[in-house]
Amino acid sequence: MAKQIPVYLFVGQLESGKTKFIQETMEDPNFDSGDKTLLLVCEEGELEYDPSRFAFGGVHVAQIEDKSELTPENLTALEKKSGCGRVIIEYNGMWLVQELYDAMPDNWLVPVKSSMNFS
């Protein structure tokens, strides 16, 4: 069985602050798991990532410019190319999330956290 890879999925409207939040997270040394990271960028906003400011190395940034690129074969190839142990996805808010779930390799896991019960 292939190694299970956690996926951090960020979904929201265009210009809702996803890129800024992810950039700030990547600048935090506490987010360094020791694993290589595949950062999938599925939309172009006003801000761009600055990998020189990331707190750790081993980050492979890949652009997904069209949802037709969301295939199990393409995502598996990106996983192998990057050698990643985790995936961060800035998802396009205009695309259906189900299309991403249908395309994700079986070993990619998206843990779901709800803030409904947080105080």
Where are the language model's segments positioned?
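Nucleotide-state-sensitive switch-loop elements of NTP-binding domains
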Residues: 2-12, 16, 20-118
